[in-house]
């Protein structure tokens, strides 16, 4: 059984777990990443967690524990270790030195090379004894895991896969 099942190919770290990713965009994960920062990918901001949280408009407390576990500095260290040299610009925004979001995506795909990718849409969460144990995909197959993480994004850009489909799953 997989340790972690990630629904949506967003930027999620595996932390050494056996991981499977269910991604419904036929072009693969990370399509929205390619257009962030006008195609340059604003990776993070070069500041501490408290300052970072000051820029979060809605419910910054929701991100508190996640950002203290994986801070902006940690993100910068990760990308540098993956061979993506970074630069800091006005407003402390951090970009790849190449100014190419594709370099960031390539590094993340390389980092996730050991993950199993399942192409298809997550249609229904599998709930047993009040706990999510997997997902049923559009082809009718079930995928089980010890933990399930929904990272489908919002509704900002449906052409990239950010169509809000994860909201329905999360309500289950």
Give residue ranges: language-model regions.
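Residue-level detector of alpha-helix initiation sites
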Residues: 6, 10-11, 154-156
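Predominantly flavin-linked oxidoreductase catalytic cores and closely associated redox partners
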Residues: 35, 102-172
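Conserved Rossmann-like nucleotide-cofactor binding loop
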Residues: 11-12, 27, 123
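Glycine-rich FAD pyrophosphate-binding loop
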Residues: 5-7, 17-38
């Amino acid at each position: 059984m997989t340790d972690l099942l990630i629904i949506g190919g967003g930027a999620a770290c595996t932390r050494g777990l056996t991981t499977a990713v269910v991604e419904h965009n036929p072009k693969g994960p990370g399509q929205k990443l390619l257009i962030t920062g006008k195609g340059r990918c604003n990776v993070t901001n070069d500041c501490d967690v408290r300052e970072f949280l000051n820029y979060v408009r809605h419910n910054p407390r929701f991100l508190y524990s996640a950002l203290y576990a994986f801070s902006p500095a940690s993100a910068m260290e990760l990308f540098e270790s993956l061979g993506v040299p970074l630069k800091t610009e006005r407003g402390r925004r951090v970009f790849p030195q190449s100014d190419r979001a594709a370099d960031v995506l390539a590094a993340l795909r390389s980092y996730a090379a050991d993950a199993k990718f399942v192409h298809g849409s997550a249609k229904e969460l599998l709930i047993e004894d009040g706990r999510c144990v997997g997902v049923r995909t559009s082809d009718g197959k079930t995928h089980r895991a010890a933990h399930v993480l929904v990272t489908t994004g919002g509704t900002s850009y449906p052409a990239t896969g950010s169509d809000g489909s994860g909201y329905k799953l999360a309500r289950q």
